[in-house]
Regions:
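Iron-associated oxidoreductase/ferritin-like identity signal
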Residues: 1-167
Length: 167
């Protein structure tokens, strides 16, 4: 595996890990403010980011590269004021950072002729477009809702669809 591509993939592992813990922290914050639906939404986002990290981690191992094992202490001291719109704006910005990082890796893969990794990353390119669009749509809804408690209640409910239990 090309050393520059490996370095970029390791940066991506770290970024996906950071995103996972960021969303986990937001899940806790929304739960503490009794927005349990939005809390569950961010818990799912955290799980998705962790899955992305593991997918890249496994790929690096399969390619006989050496993936990093990220730490998790980096968000401990960060505090966030509870403003729903601002928190979703931060989330969209987080997704944009991930998208830019993926695009940077794809560009490097093209430059060095690493078509296997470029092909592997196409799933992430599509996934990031979907993630950014999801957060843009939520922010558009928040602009319409404003501070309307009924609208916030509905958003909270919408972001926490009922689960079906299989017995």
């Amino acid at each position: 595996m090309n050393k520059e591509v490996l370095s970029l993939l390791n940066e991506q592992i770290w970024l996906e890990n950071t995103a996972s813990f960021f969303y986990l922290k937001l899940s806790k914050l929304f739960s503490e403010n009794n927005y349990f639906g939005i809390s569950n939404f961010f818990l799912e986002q955290s799980n998705e980011e962790r899955e992305h990290m593991l997918k890249i981690f496994s790929y690096v191992l399969e390619q006989e590269g050496e993936p990093i094992v990220p730490n998790y202490n980096f968000l401990e001291d960060e505090e966030y004021d509870f403003n729903i719109t601002v928190l979703f704006e931060c989330s969209l910005e987080n997704e944009r950072k991930v998208t830019n990082s993926i695009n940077k890796i794809v560009s490097k893969c093209k430059e060095v002729g690493d078509y296997t990794t470029e092909n592997f990353l196409q799933w992430f390119v599509v996934e990031q477009r979907e993630e950014e669009n999801k957060f843009k749509e939520i922010l558009d809804n928040l602009k319409i809702i404003g501070n309307n408690s009924v609208g916030l209640y509905e958003l909270n409910k919408t972001l926490n669809p009922p689960t079906t239990s299989e017995e």
